[in-house]
Amino acid sequence: MVNLTKLLITCVLSYCFLFADNNSPYVMVLGTAQDGGAPHAGCVKNCCSDKWGSSGKQFRVSCLGIVDPKTKEVWMIDATPDFPQQLNELTQNGKYKLRGIFLTHAHIGHYTGLIHLGREVMGAKEIPVYVMPRLKHFIESNGPWNQLISLKQIILNPLEDHGIVKLNDNLSVTPFTVPHRDEYSETGGFQVSGLTSKLMFIPDIDKWDKWEQNIREVIKDN
């Protein structure tokens, strides 16, 4: 099923970037569904039945793209099972350069798209992948993900809670943690900041009242 909370929060918090002028950084909402997309594998309920065989009714897994039209650079937040289509849309069929991928956590809808960077598919070279400490350890300790490291197809860049990452002169990203099922890694969200605007992207969280932040105040501040 589609996670309507993801859709609402993504759309509301993206407002300031989506209506930027042609030369300003902006974001692309590349997906809004939970880990398995919609329709889900094995789903025969009404929420899925009309989506099988109809690509126009299908929903891709939650993913956000960051675009700087001045530098022709793009970044992704999360590498989903829909990575091929989302990458192509974000880079405009290769016209823009993928400069990095930020991962939120180790649930299948948020990191398994990395497999397409391997030698069986893209054979990528040193794509920066930004990860929090537990997620970094998970990728380093488990195949096939650690093969991406050994073959230098990805370069892991460690993140710190609320540590600012400068992407270029126009953009920065700040990670933070949120409460969620953390079986294999912590769960993060990201604040994306431009020169005049910023937004916050939280694709997964258990409950807003479990977070030490007040979501209403966060929206006001972003």
Where are each of the predicted segments found?
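Short beta-strand/turn micro-motifs composed of small residues
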Residues: G31, V131-P133
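Active-site metal-binding motif and surrounding structural segment of the metallo-beta-lactamase
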Residues: D68-Y130
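A short, active-site helix/loop in glycosyltransferases that binds the activated sugar's phosphate group
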Residues: R134-G143
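Hydrophobic h-region of N-terminal signal peptides that target proteins for export
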Residues: C11-A20
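Sec-dependent signal peptide recognition
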Residues: V2-T10
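Core dinuclear metal-dependent hydrolase active-site scaffold
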Residues: D21-L90, L156-E217
